[in-house]
Each structure stands twice: as C-alpha cells, then as structure tokens.
Amino acid sequence: FKPFVYSAAIEKGYTPGTIVNDAPVKFGRYSPKNSGGSYAGPITIREALYRSRNVVAVKVLHAIGVDYARSYVQRFGFPAKNIPKDLTMVLGSGQATPLQMARGYSVFANGGYLIEPYIIDRIYNDKGQLIARTQPLVAGISAPRTIDPKNAFIMYKMLQDVIQYGTGRAALALGRSDIAGKTGTTNNQKDAWFVG
C-alpha cells in the first residue's frame, strides 16, 4: 500500500526528493520496524519506496494524516471498509484482492484513470452467435480520471525505480524497460508477491 500513500503525499506537496529520516520512532505504543531491523538515516521518499522502508512510509502517513490518506486511496478503487483506520494501513494491513491491487496500480500506468478490469471479453452461444460482449471503461475516453496525471507519472517513475534499483530487480530478467511495480511481503517472509 506504500505507493498509494506516497501518491497521497505527492498530492499534498511532497516530491520524490523529499527527505524523511529513516530512524526508530514510536507513535504511542506502535513502533514500526524495517525488514532486517536496519535504518538508513535521512533518505528521499523515492529511495524509501524502492528500498521498501517501512518506517519512512509510516512517518509519511502520519505527516499527511490517516483520514486524508484513507479517503485518497479510495480513488484507486479500494472500498473504505477494507482500509484500516491507523498507521498500519501503509504497510498493507488491510484487505485487498489481487484484482483490486492490479486495478489500483493500473491508475499509475494509465495516466491517472481508474479502469474496470474484466476477465471475459465475449460470450458466444452454441451456434457461434455473439450474445454478450464486455464494454470496458477506456483510459482517456470513458474511464474517470481519479488522480492528477503528473502524480500518476511521478509514481510510475518511482515504481520503475523499484525494478531498476530496489526490491523488484528480478523483473529485469523480462528484458522490458516499461516495467514498474512493487514487491510485498508478510511478517516473517511467509508470503511474497509483486504487483505492477
């Protein structure tokens, strides 16, 4: 969920070059940790994203406000009921299906437009006659623009850095220059995935 919160921060005036101190912090009884327990000190949010620094993400969310961020991330198609009302939201503690995540990330790739994914394009009857066809929302034509195109571009570039320099380097094996996305893991590395 880090990219969605960073997008909200960009909307509030942050830039990829905004520096946040990656250092231990406590918010009441909550003390976020980075994977591996290390800290990088002052770091740009761009680098914090591609290195997947949890503490920086939580600090950014705290600075922009949980309520604002919850409202903002709904622009990516996530239902409010599945978005936590606390700082753990940025670390992916809510509920989202893989399809919802793909739809959310597509906003960055589509210039800020929220499309509706579909699986079935056409249905034919037993006589070969077309009986139904999907009419999807098309980015730039019928889909709603839910974030500023500059924001979408900045986030797309930041997500490309995840592939070039960060935790998603394995995707370089595909030999494509347009890949952008984010890795994700659960506590204790039980589950891992990539979306983008």
Language-model features, listed with the residues they occupy:
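Conserved catalytic neighborhood of penicillin-recognizing serine enzymes
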Residues: 14-69, 86, 114, 126-154, ...
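Soluble periplasmic/extracytoplasmic beta-strand elements of cell-envelope proteins
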Residues: 19-21, 90-92, 122
